[in-house]
């Protein structure tokens, strides 16, 4: 029994349906049903296009305990819902009733999926679920079943039919606009049917009404507001009969649809309650005309009307048809006289008002429908059949009958009264005047329509106002006579009377009687007394017969003539009135229509206008703001450019003048003269000079600027100058480090000129910041770097002076330089300049000092004096290095190279010879001064060369000068450089002290130098790498530097390192992006930092990516000018030219202080620009390298010397690093340790034994030669590539390193130690260095570093990829660490460090070496070597192509990242798992661990499946290495695996989720989302930017074992997307944003749109994934992020490990990565089964998703292998989905298959799709599993094609449904199984009872 209730919501109709016991019959049919189970999908997998066909039903369950609060909660579903429910008295529902409501607006709460907005909201079924009924009782299930069945069927029918009909019949929805005649026809037919059926179907409450046919009319379909105002209409719907129809217009619904579903029979009754009075259900004809079965349901009118009044016209407007009208006209008339009186004519206004009233009533469709009797008496042909007799209020033509008319003239007869028995008598107000028995023929109906309005209001007239109606006898009663009628009648009568009178003279009585009756007021009675007249006439004498006949004749005559006339007249009049009325109607309706249209149009127009204007305003404002921004920017640019240009010109002039001036100061001093005093004096002079100069310059500048068309106010000048200061100073700082070597004199001069010492101090902040940044670059904790720098400020100058004085030129330079560097770059500049200038003068002293060790000691003391001599020495070393580098660079032109070679030879010799004189050569190198004694000459030359450089900016000039200088000096400039080193170094070989000094130049610098030497050591380490890389760049230079450095190696190296580092500190920051972390920079910087940071052990120096160690002279000049600019700017800082230099300086200082922050920012920017410049210069430099290659022989010699030092130092350093580690070869260790201690500044370490030196030298020589050659080759090959892929530089270096490594490998056995340094030099990018897990400091460093980098990058707005990388690094690092810790906890496995025999001794040595060097690097090296050996040079063979890949850049970074990540992960994991690892298949763990390291290894690593064998787990430190050996046990301990899995999950999840998510979001905000997407799309095929690292790692790894591993893992993850939806979706989101990172400039509009799209997509996806794939709660993975993440990570990791294990074991011998790949892909499927957690194992992806890999195959087309995100647990398919936005095909793991099934299953169906949402109002006791199953059953029975569930917890159900479908279960089977389950459960014991329905079904399936 279904109740329609009016919810007073215009849009909703509710139907209350209840079920009789018949339901149980239908249940039987269900039990036997053999229908297929429909496919089930999570709502999230819904595709956009499916939403259109989607029918949605929501079941809302409540019970007795549901209270108001619960109901109010439903506001979340729909705001109106609580009110509707309450108004429906839903609480009164009984157990077998449900209420169906349509069109409940669904707010976002329910359909957060944006797709859901598009489809019409569905049905809401409210049902009572009484908790009292025992849950396991079968009848409870039946009642649930029936409720769901009714709701679902009702919904389907409603919506499907509605769709049908909206398509087929939506013609005449607006009934008021139908043409009148069609309405009339409608009702005619309707009433005829009614009449026929009325008798057979008496209307009663039990009346059976069937389901609507599909032809149900459109009126009912369009539910208008009125329809819904009905009150309680109960409709019983029974499926039995299809013939009759109950169609309440309120139900905008077809109950149960025309496709009757046999299984459920519901019977429905209809009853009507009181409020139906005066309501008419009005329905348009369309369907009803066509379908004779259709019936109107009529409801008895309100009790006010008698039962007789059973007919009322259903339609407000009814006309006679033409035929009836004709008939009415044929009736004979008696024509009265026609007195025309004003009163009798109703004014037209009243008619019009009536007309409109009739419409009002017409619109109230509340009048009840009343059946009308149709008089269908065929006998009465004459009488027109009034098709709808209107009675009561529904009269059709109610004309007010005016009873207050004045009396008719006496001769007019009264109308005849109605017969008393006339059915209409009771309707008349006329007095009961007697009625003559006989009705004369004149009574035949004369219908006078003249005054009757066709549109008189419905039911608005009194009973008397009816039309004349024929009574059964056919008599016509004329009731509504008009005045006209009376006039005619009287006229006729008077004429006839006169005629008769004239003939018979007997008419008086009649006339009198008429007059009397009129006087009596009987005119009200319309009675004709013709009968009496006739009788009187007849009663006359027979003699009067003639008269009678005459009378008759006259009467006939009159009748005929007048009758015909009147008939014609009547016809004309009526047609006229009809026409007029029609016209009036049409006019009014059209007028109204037009008016409304106009209103609507105007409103729309205004809205549109408003919208457009709003839009326009917005656009205009945007445009304006953008324009303004651009304008400002342009202005700024113009201004800056102008100022910059001016500054540059100025700087050049200044430089020239300044140099000239300075040259005057640089008069030679006698060695005896007190150098310190002169130095101080000169300082003052220089400062004063600088100030004066700056004043004049400033004045000139203002003059210049005033001429520029840029408005240049003082303020502007000030700001500009400050900016410049910041910019330039920053720049100069960088260059200073970089360019120091080139023209320290310039720097010194400039600095000296412009800055007083105090300034330095104040500026230190900026410089410090710079340093910090450089430190950051190298991943030194900022604070450390800062602290290191602080001491230098004050001391630097003193140190410099002393250093200069005390130590040799080189030393002094070095020290001072170091000091300067320490002080800050500026100081460096200043110091260097001073040093250079002064040193040139002091040189003799220095040289002298230098030669003797005493001098060195003095130096040390002097340096000590300043502050931290060690630091100073470091800096000095760095400076020296830089200087040397720069000089070498400047000399690098071809000629120079030759000289360099010569020099090299000379130097090497001198080194051996230990020629102290050359010490000055350091300065000489700087200055190319030939004779150390000729300080003046040296100074002059220096200044000249510098000036020339600055002026000419041409390398050629420099070389010439250099040559000259060289010749004079007898050393080429490069020679000089080398000389510098050699000078020191010569001593080094000769005397142990010198050796010590030389080696570290520490002896000279003593403690400081030791530190320096340490620096050197580190730098050496770096150098080795540098040589490899630099070899390309300027191997010669480096080698030259290094060789001379042999002794000074330390210094020079450190310098080099510094110089590189410094040069690149910026590049470095930049380099990240560009030079793949210019390893050199990284190394050097690292070294520096390490030096500063004694804690930090120099990790493997990243191979020097082509840091342009030797910038062209132009570069130097640029740097110089920059510095100058900086100084100038400082001077300028005071807006106006300072009145006194002091003031200006003070002002600048204060400003500087204020602007420190800005300066720092500037520095960052500066670093950036510098790095760019450096990079560009790098590209320039490569060719030079090639040129150098010509002189390979000399190079080799040089290389030997260099190599010896490098190797010794590097090995020593490495050894020192490793002291805490278990070193397999202690011998190697010792020297290394020394080096390390050196860092600690223990001079002892500085003294390598002669033997060591010799062996090292020999080995180094060979090595160096090879390195150089290799490097050159590589450089040549890769020049272009390198530059293209700056990031790749590391990679390239790596290759070189590989080659070197190969060589080393060969030699490694012999000189394992030596190998180390190179290994150290492996390309681990700087990021990696930070990640070294070994050193605790490093961890923090990495974090800080990453953070800082990120900040810088963000500020620079620069490379989003870099930023992401940093994030990823940091994140990965943290997550890995924490994950490992977690894993350790969970596993509780103690680390057993085991060493396994290494298959090849070589490998062993390598390994050991590796161990010594940073593990990661070693690993890489080992792996690389091994992989090279084992599988051929991977890069060469397999990945040469890849090398070319643009990805290489990323690859290197990836390696670094992955390495670090992998290392830490593997390390920890292995540690924790070692014990259990034994149980794991060797390959498994190894591949896992090694692969990871392998990633870094690059392609080679990829090859590493074999690596595991070779690698030995040397020590715990090398946990990563627990090589295959450790894993030999094949039994995988579940716990281990699980631990790994957990850890992996956690790591992955936390990492990605937390970091990437948040950071990415931030980042993405800055980046424009549009680019995001586009970029993402671009990326999608090959590079997953998501976690670029992981991606690339995987990509590259894919090729090799690691790739398999990842691939496998990824495939696992991807293949099991269902299991970790949450995680994947999370990832996915972050990934999208990741992708977005790369591009930065986007239009706002696009951005907004894009962002929306992306967000929508992401959310959609995420949701989809969540529902389709999230593990069911039972799987044990909590939904809380952490636990979930953990479990997920664990799973991922485990799967990965397992897979890898299989893959490795299977493919160990496979050298071709492709084969590995295939194995891995197979493995993917295998692993699914192995999954130890088992939560995924249920998903049988093997069959369903074999194409899964293909779905994201394109990710790694380059490898031919489907990459996976598994390394970080990323889901490949997700990634793909995001990128390729047509995701819908493969979002859910199940979708594809389901779709195919549906295609098969539902071909014959109309493809019904149903979305079911269940809402429980607390406390509701339906078992959700039962509910889902039952709904599924019903939907299947109803032949739904696709069933979607909104509940996200139905993962298990998805599984179950899949299995059941596969097993071929039918609806009946499933229902029986459910019933059986409950029966079993009733009998089962309490333990068994806990088994859920799904589980039970799965078991029994």
From Swiss-Prot:
InterPro entries according to UniProt: SPHK1-interactor_AKAP_110
Record keywords: Cytoplasm, Cytoskeleton, Phosphoprotein
Domain of life: Eukaryota
Phosphoserine modification, residue list: 18, 422, 433, 444, 448, 1171, 1176-1177, 1242, 1337, 1580
Record field: compositional bias (Basic and acidic residues): 1747-1756
GO MF entries: protein kinase A binding; protein kinase A regulatory subunit binding; protein phosphatase 1 binding
Alphabetical GO biological process terms: cortical actin cytoskeleton organization; intracellular signal transduction; protein localization; protein localization to endosome; renal water homeostasis
Residues bearing the modification Phosphothreonine: 981, 1100, 1485
Comp. bias regions, Polar residues: 1141-1153, 1713-1740
Region feature PKA-RII subunit binding domain, mapped onto this chain: 1650-1663
Record region (Disordered): 407-443, 843-864, 971-993, 1131-1153, 1708-1805
Compartments in which it is found: Cytoplasm; Cytoplasm, Cytoskeleton, Microtubule organizing center, Centrosome
Acidic residues composition-biased segments: 1787-1801
Disulfide bridges in this chain: none
GO annotation, cellular component aspect: centrosome; cytoplasm; cytosol; nucleolus; plasma membrane
Organs and tissues of expression: Expressed in heart, brain, lung, liver, kidney, testis and ovary. Weakly expressed in skeletal muscle, pancreas and spleen.
Sequence ranges of Low complexity compositional bias: 1757-1772
Protein function: Binds to type II regulatory subunits of protein kinase A and anchors/targets them.
Domain comment in the entry: RII-alpha binding site, predicted to form an amphipathic helix, could participate in protein-protein interactions with a complementary surface on the R-subunit dimer.
Recorded family membership: Belongs to the AKAP110 family.
Name under which the protein is recorded: A-kinase anchor protein 11
């Amino acid at each position: 029994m279904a109740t329609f209730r009016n919810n007073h919501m215009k849009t909703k109709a509710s139907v209350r349906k209840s079920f009789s016991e018949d339901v149980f019959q239908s249940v039987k049919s269900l039990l036997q049903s053999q229908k297929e189970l429909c496919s089930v999908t999570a709502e999230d997998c819904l595709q956009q296009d499916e939403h259109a066909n989607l029918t949605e039903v929501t079941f809302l369950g409540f019970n007795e305990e549901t209270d108001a609060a619960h109901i109010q909660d439903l506001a979340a579903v729909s705001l109106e819902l609580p009110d509707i429910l309450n108004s429906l008295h839903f609480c009164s529902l009984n157990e077998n009733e449900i209420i169906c409501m349509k069109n409940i607006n669904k707010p976002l709460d329910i359909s957060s999926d944006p797709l859901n907005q598009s489809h019409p909201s569905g049905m809401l079924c409210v049902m009572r679920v009484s908790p009292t009924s025992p849950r396991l009782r079968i009848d409870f299930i039946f009642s649930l079943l029936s409720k769901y069945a009714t709701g679902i069927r009702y919904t389907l029918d409603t919506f499907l039919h509605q769709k049908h009909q909206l398509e087929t019949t939506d013609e005449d929805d607006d009934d008021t606009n139908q043409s009148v005649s069609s309405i009339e026809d409608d009702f005619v037919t309707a009433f005829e049917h009614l009449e026929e059926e009325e008798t057979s179907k008496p209307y009663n409450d039990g009346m059976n009404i069937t389901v609507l046919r599909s032809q149900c009319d459109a009126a009912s379909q369009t539910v208008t507001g009125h329809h819904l105002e009905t009150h309680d209409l109960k409709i019983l719907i029974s499926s039995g009969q299809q013939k009759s129809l109950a169609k309440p217009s309120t139900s905008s619904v077809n109950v149960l649809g025309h496709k009757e579903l046999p299984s459920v029979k519901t019977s429905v009754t209809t009853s009507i309650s009181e409020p139906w009075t005066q309501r008419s259900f009005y329905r348009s004809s369309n369907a009803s005309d066509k379908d004779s079965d259709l019936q109107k349901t009529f409801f008895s009118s309100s009790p006010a009307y008698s039962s007789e009044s059973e007919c009322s016209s259903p339609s407000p407007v009814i006309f006679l048809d033409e035929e009836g009208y004709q008939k009415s006209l044929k009736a004979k008339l008696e024509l009265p006289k026609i007195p025309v009186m004003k009163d009798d004519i109703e004014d037209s206004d009243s008619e019009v008002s009536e007309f409109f009233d009739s419409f009002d009533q017409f619109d109230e469709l509340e009048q009840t429908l009343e059946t009308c009797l149709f008089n269908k008496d065929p006998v009465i042909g004459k009488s027109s059949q009034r098709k709808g007799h209107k009675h009561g209020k529904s009269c059709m033509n109610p004309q007010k009958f005016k009873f207050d008319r004045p009396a008719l003239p006496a001769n007019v007869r009264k109308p005849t009264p109605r017969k008393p028995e006339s059915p209409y008598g009771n309707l008349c107000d006329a007095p009961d005047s007697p009625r003559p028995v006989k009705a004369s023929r004149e009574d035949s109906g004369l219908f006078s329509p003249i005054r009757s309005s066709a549109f008189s209001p419905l039911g608005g007239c009194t009973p008397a106002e009816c039309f004349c109606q024929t009574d059964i006898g056919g008599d016509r009663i004329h009731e509504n006579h008009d005045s006209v009628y009376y006039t005619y009648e009287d006229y006729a009568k008077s004429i006839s009377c006169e005629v008769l009178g004239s003939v018979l003279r007997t008419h008086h009585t009649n006339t009198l009687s008429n007059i009397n009756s009129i006087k009596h007021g009987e005119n009200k009675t319309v009675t004709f007394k013709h009968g009496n007249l006739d009788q009187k006439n007849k009663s006359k004498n027979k003699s009067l017969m003639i008269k009678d006949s005459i009378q008759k004749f006259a009467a006939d005559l009159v009748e005929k003539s007048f009758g015909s006339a009147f008939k014609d007249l009547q016809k004309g009049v009526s047609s006229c009135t009809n026409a007029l009325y029609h016209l009036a109607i049409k006019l009014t309706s059209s007028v109204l229509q037009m008016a409304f249209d106009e209103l609507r149009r105007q409103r729309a127009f205004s809205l549109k206008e408003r919208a457009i204007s709003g839009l326009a305003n917005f656009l205009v404002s945007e445009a304006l703001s953008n324009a303004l921004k651009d304008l400002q920017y342009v202005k700024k640019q113009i201004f800056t450019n102008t100022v910059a240009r001016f500054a540059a010109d100025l700087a050049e002039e200044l430089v020239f003048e300044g140099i000239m001036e300075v040259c005057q100061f640089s008069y030679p001093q006698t060695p005896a003269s007190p150098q310190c005093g002169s130095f101080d004096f000169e300082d003052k002079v220089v400062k004063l000079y600088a100030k004066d100069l700056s004043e004049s310059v400033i004045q000139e500048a203002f003059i210049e600027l005033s001429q520029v068309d840029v408005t240049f106010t003082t303020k502007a000048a000030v700001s500009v100058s400050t900016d410049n200061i910041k910019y330039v100073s920053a720049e100069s700082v960088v260059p200073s480090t970089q360019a120091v070597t080139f023209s320290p004199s310039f720097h010194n001069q400039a600095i000296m000129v412009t800055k007083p010492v105090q300034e330095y101090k104040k500026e230190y902040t900026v410089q410090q910041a710079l340093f910090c940044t450089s430190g950051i670059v190298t991943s030194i904790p900022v604070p450390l770097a800062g602290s290191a720098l602080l001491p230098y400020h004050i001391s630097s100058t003193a140190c410099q002076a002393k250093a200069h004085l005390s130590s040799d030129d080189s030393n002094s330079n070095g020290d001072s330089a170091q000091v300067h560097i320490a002080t800050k770059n500026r100081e460096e500049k200043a110091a260097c300049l001073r040093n250079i200038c002064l040193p040139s003068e002091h040189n003799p002293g220095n040289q002298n000092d230098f030669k003797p060790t005493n001098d060195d000691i003095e130096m040390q003391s002097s340096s000590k004096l300043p502050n931290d001599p060690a630091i100073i020495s470091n800096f000095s070393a760095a400076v020296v290095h830089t200087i040397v580098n720069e000089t070498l660079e400047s000399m690098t032109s071809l000629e120079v190279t030759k000289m360099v070679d010569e020099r090299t030879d000379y130097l090497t010799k001198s080194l051996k010879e230990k020629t102290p004189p050359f010490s000055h050569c350091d300065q000489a190198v700087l200055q190319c001064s030939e004779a150390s004694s000729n300080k003046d000459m040296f100074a002059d030359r220096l200044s000249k060369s510098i000036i020339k450089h600055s002026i000419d900016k041409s390398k050629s000039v420099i070389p010439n000068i250099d040559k000259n200088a060289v010749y004079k000096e007898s050393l080429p400039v490069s020679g000089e450089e080398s000389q510098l080193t050699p000078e020191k170094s010569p001593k080094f070989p000769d005397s142990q002290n010198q050796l010590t000094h030389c080696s570290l130049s520490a002896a000279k610098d003593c403690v400081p130098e030791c530190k320096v030497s340490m620096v050197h050591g580190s730098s050496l380490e770096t150098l080795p790498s540098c040589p490899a890389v630099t070899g390309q760049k300027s191997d010669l230079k480096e080698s030259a530097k290094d060789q001379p450095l042999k002794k000074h190696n330390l210094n020079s190296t450190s310098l080099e390192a510094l110089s590189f580092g410094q040069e690149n500190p910026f590049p470095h920051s930049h380099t990240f992006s560009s030079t793949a972390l210019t390893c050199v920079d990284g190394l050097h910087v690292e070294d520096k930092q390490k030096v500063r940071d004694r804690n930090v052990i120099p990790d493997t120096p990243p191979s020097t990516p082509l840091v342009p160690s030797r910038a062209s002279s132009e570069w130097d000049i640029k740097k110089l000018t920059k510095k100058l600019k900086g100084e100038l700017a400082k001077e300028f800082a005071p807006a106006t030219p300072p009145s006194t230099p002091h003031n200006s300086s003070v002002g600048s200082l204060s400003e500087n202080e204020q602007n420190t922050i800005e300066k720092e920012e500037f520095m960052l920017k500066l670093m950036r620009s510098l790095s760019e410049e450096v990079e560009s210069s790098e590209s320039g430099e490569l060719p030079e390298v090639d040129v150098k290659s010509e002189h390979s022989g000399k190079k080799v010699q040089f290389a030997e010397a260099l190599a010896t030092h490098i190797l010794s130092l590097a090995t020593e350093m490495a050894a020192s690093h490793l002291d805490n580690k278990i070193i397999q070869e202690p011998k190697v260790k010792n020297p290394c340790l020394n080096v390390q201690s050196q860092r600690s500044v223990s001079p002892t370490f500085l003294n390598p034994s002669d033997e060591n030196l010799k062996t090292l030298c020999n080995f180094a020589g060979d090595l160096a030669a090879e390195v150089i050659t290799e490097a050159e080759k590589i450089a040549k090959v890769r020049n272009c590539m390198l530059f293209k892929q700056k990031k790749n530089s590391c990679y390239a270096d790596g290759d070189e390193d590989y080659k070197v490594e190969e060589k080393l490998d060969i030699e490694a056995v012999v000189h394992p130690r030596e190998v180390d340094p190179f290994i150290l030099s492996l390309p681990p990018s700087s990021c990696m260095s930070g990640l070294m897990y070994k050193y605790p400091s490093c961890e923090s460093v990495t974090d800080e570093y990453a953070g800082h980098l990120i900040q810088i990058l963000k500020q620079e707005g620069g490379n989003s990829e870099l930023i992401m990388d940093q994030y990823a690094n940091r994140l990965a690092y943290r997550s890995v660490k924490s994950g490992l810790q977690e894993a350790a906890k969970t596993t509780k496995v103690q680390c057993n460090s085991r060493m396994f025999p290494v298959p090849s001794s070589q490998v062993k040595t390598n390994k050991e070496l590796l161990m010594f060097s940073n593990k990661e690097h070693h690993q890489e090296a080992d792996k690389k070597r091994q992989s090279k050996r084992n599988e051929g040079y991977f890069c060469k063979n397999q990945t040469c192509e890849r090398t070319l890949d643009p990805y290489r850049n990323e690859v290197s970074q990836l390696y670094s990242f992955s390495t670090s990540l992998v290392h830490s992960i593997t390390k920890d994991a292995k540690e924790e798992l070692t014990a259990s690892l034994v149980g794991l298949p060797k390959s498994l763990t190894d591949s896992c661990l090694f692969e990871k390291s392998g990633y870094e290894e690059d392609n080679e690593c990829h090859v590493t499946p074999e690596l595991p064998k070779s690698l030995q787990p040397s020590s715990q430190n090398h946990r990563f290495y627990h090589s295959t050996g450790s894993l030999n046990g094949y039994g995988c301990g579940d716990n281990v695996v699980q631990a790994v899995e957990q850890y992996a999950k956690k790591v992955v999840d936390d990492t990605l989720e937390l970091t990437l998510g948040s950071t990415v979001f931030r980042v993405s905000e800055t980046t424009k989302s549009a680019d995001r997407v586009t970029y993402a799309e671009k990326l999608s095929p090959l590079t997953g930017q998501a976690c670029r690292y992981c991606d690339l790692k995987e990509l590259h790894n894919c090729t090799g074992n690691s790739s398999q591993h990842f691939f496998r893992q990824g495939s696992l993850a991807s293949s099991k997307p269902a299991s970790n939806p949450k995680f994947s979706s999370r990832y996915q989101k972050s990934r999208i944003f990741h992708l977005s990172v790369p591009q930065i400039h986007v239009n706002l509009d696009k951005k907004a749109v894009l962002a929306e799209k992306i967000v929508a997509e992401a959310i959609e996806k995420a949701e989809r994934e969540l529902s389709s794939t999230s593990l069911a709660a039972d799987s044990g993975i909590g939904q809380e992020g952490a636990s979930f993440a953990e479990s997920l990570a664990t799973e991922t990791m485990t799967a990965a490990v397992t897979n890898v294990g299989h893959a490795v074991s299977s493919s160990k011998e496979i050298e071709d990565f492709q084969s590995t790949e295939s194995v891995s892909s197979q493995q993917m499927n295998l692993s699914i089964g192995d999954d130890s957690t088992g939560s995924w194992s249920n998903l049988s992806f093997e069959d369903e998703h074999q194409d899964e890999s293909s779905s994201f195959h394109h990710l790694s087309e380059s490898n031919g292998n489907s990459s996976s995100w598994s390394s970080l647990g990323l889901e490949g398919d997700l990634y793909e989905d995001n990128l390729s936005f047509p995701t819908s095909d493969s979002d859910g793991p199940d979708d594809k298959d389901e779709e195919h099934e549906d295609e098969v299953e539902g071909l014959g169906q109309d493809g019904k799709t149903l979305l079911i949402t269940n809402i429980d109002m607390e406390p509701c006791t339906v078992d959700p599993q039962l509910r889902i199953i039952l709904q599924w059953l019903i939907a299947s029975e109803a032949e739904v094609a696709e069933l979607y569930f909104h509940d996200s917890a139905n993962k298990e159900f998805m599984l179950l449904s899949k299995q059941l479908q596969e097993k071929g279960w039918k609806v009946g089977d499933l229902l029986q199984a459910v019933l059986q389950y409950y029966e079993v459960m009733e009998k089962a014991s309490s333990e068994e009872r806990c088994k859920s329905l799904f589980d039970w079904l799965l078991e029994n399936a």
